[in-house]
Every structure is written in structure tokens, then in C-alpha cells.
């Protein structure tokens, strides 16, 4: 007698196992040269679990087991592998957490933590590596958002005032955002933290990856302190660079002979993109900026390549780390 399987459950199970096995094969995962817990280079194969190779550390003080998934961004994600692919694709389509949860049949809390696990992995793996020639530097200001905060307690009067302020545009835009972009490269977008200035933000994140004779270009509306900092920086450029771009320093401004093409207004696109999320807590905003930089990049990525890139290079981030890394300091 042939066993009935009208719902083709066995085929579905086989596809799931085959996909999981393919995901974690030797070519797709990080190869271990040492124990991820103690650093010992002495470890042995220790069987398989769900067709995934496991290992055991031979260090007497450790003796922990680990596998190809131990430091993967997908560690502890108990749902089917297909959902991990689908979730990245939905993120790229700016789908809300509610819609992701409904479509993938997961809880909103799970969707939230999946999103931030991926954000952390993307932030470690996809970032501007170097600026070489002409960098367009700009500043952008936004209001502070306390969405999801448990330490910020509002009275009814506070809520009424906040609603009134938003209605009439009275909310102070006191969060400064630094934008640095070079044609053909991934832009750098970063919020200025509470304990730093816009100048520190620029020096620590843009100058750090800029080539020696990189020209920093800005416009009239940029932050005055930042403009002055850029002026002092550009004065030190070599004569060859100044001649190349036709730089003339006139008082407190710089003129050049760079032909201005029709440049995309990155701030307008960024604001429109963020508005789809219906409010983002300021403590998380840098992750969204970094994700937008990936989307805005002229280099084309697809969700499959991102998945396997994060699988190989993205580091695992626990829920506990996500919570402690974003302590509410308002």
C-alpha cells in the first residue's frame, strides 16, 4: 500500500532540508580555524544536526560544541529558511513590520528582531570603504523620536503639547545628520551622537576613510562650523588638486570649476523613504541610514546575494545585545 500524502508534506520537508543543507554547505559559510568560544585551534568533528556539521573543542577548559551556524546572523532563527530570504526581499521593498509578520506568519516581535539582526549584520558588512576624489558633504536636521521608549514617561499634558507642536511644526530639529557621498560609491549617512559634535562626526567617519588629497565639497546651506572645518581642510590640499578642480579660496568660501550635473537630492529621497516606516526611534536611526545607503548605492544588489554575503561575513547578534546596545539615553 502506498501512503497517501495529498498535501505533499514530504516534498515540502525534503525541499526545506535540501535548502538548509545547501545554505550551510562549505562554500557558503565561514570556515573555522579555531574555536569561536576560547580560540583553541584544536577541535574535532562531532556529528551532524539537521545535516549541518558540528564540531567539539578539545580544550579541557572549554569542550564546547559549535557548528557552521554558531556565529551566523541566522543563528537561533527557528523558522524555515525560505522565510529568511523572503524577509530580506520584503525589507528591500520597504514593507512594514505588520505586513512582514502577516505575510510570513510570524509575530511582530520576531519581525522586529529579525530586522535589527539583519541591520547589525549589514552595518558590519556593507559600508563605504574609501572616498577618493570629490566628496559632497552635507548636513540634515531632524527631530528626536522617542518611539518605543520605556524610559520616557509622558503625562497627558505632554502628549497634547507634542501633538500640537507637530501640527504646527514647532518640534525642534535638534538631531544633526552628516551625509557624505561620492559619485559611483555607497554614501555615508550618520547621525551625530549625543556626546559628539558634527565636526567630530565628520573627522571620525569621513576623514578616516578619505584619500590624502580628497576634495570636500559642500554648499551654502551646510552647518557653519562644518563649512569652516572643510575650508581649513581644503586649504591644505596640494597645488595639483587645487589646479585640477580650479579651486579658489575667497574669504570664507571656496569656488571651483566642477560642472554641476543634475544631482539627486539625497535628503528628499531619504526623508520620503523613512516616512514609509511611520516613525523610527532616534536610537535606531543609524541602522536605517546605513540600510538606505545600501539601497541608494549605484551598485546593484539582490536579496539572494545579500543573504549569502551576510551568511559568510555577517556576525551573530543576540537579542540581549540588541537591547543593551540601544540603552535609552535621552
Task: List PLM regions with ranges.
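Residue-level recognition of single "structural anchor" positions
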Residues: 1-330
Amino acid at each position: 500500500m502506498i501512503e497517501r500524502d495529498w498535501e505533499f508534506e514530504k516534498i515540502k520537508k525534503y525541499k526545506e532540508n535540501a535548502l538548509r543543507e545547501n545554505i550551510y554547505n562549505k562554500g557558503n559559510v565561514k570556515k573555522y580555524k579555531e574555536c569561536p568560544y576560547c580560540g583553541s585551534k584544536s577541535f574535532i568533528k562531532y556529528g551532524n544536526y539537521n545535516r549541518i556539521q558540528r564540531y567539539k573543542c578539545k580544550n579541557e577548559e572549554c569542550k564546547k560544541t559549535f557548528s557552521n551556524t554558531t556565529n551566523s546572523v541566522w543563528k537561533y532563527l527557528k523558522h524555515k529558511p525560505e522565510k529568511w530570504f523572503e524577509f530580506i526581499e520584503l525589507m528591500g521593498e520597504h514593507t512594514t513590520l505588520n505586513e512582514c509578520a502577516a505575510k510570513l506568519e510570524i509575530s511582530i516581535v520576531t519581525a522586529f528582531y529579525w530586522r535589527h539582526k539583519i541591520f547589525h549584520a549589514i552595518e558590519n558588512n556593507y559600508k563605504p570603504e574609501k572616498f577618493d576624489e570629490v566628496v559632497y558633504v552635507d548636513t540634515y536636521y531632524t527631530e528626536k523620536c522617542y518611539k518605543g521608549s520605556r524610559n520616557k514617561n509622558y503625562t497627558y499634558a505632554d502628549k497634547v503639547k507634542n501633538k500640537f507642536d507637530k501640527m504646527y511644526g514647532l518640534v525642534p530639529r535638534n538631531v544633526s545628520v552628516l551625509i557624505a557621498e561620492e559619485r559611483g560609491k555607497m554614501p555615508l549617512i550618520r547621525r551625530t551622537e549625543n556626546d559628539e559634535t558634527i565636526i567630530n562626526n565628520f573627522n571620525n567617519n569621513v576623514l578616516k576613510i578619505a584619500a590624502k588629497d580628497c576634495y570636500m565639497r559642500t554648499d551654502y546651506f551646510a552647518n557653519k562650523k562644518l563649512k569652516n572645518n572643510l575650508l581649513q581642510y581644503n586649504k591644505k590640499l596640494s597645488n595639483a588638486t587645487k589646479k585640477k578642480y580650479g579651486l579658489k579660496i575667497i574669504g570664507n568660501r571656496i569656488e571651483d570649476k566642477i560642472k554641476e550635473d543634475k544631482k539627486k537630492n539625497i535628503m528628499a529621497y531619504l526623508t520620503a523613504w523613512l516616512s514609509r516606516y511611520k516613525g523610527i526611534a532616534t536610537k535606531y536611526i543609524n541602522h536605517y541610514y546605513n540600510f538606505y545607503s545600501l539601497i541608494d548605492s549605484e551598485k546593484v544588489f539582490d536579496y539572494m546575494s545579500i543573504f549569502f554575503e551576510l551568511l559568510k561575513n555577517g556576525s551573530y547578534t543576540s537579542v540581549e545585545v540588541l537591547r543593551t546596545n540601544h540603552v535609552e539615553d535621552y
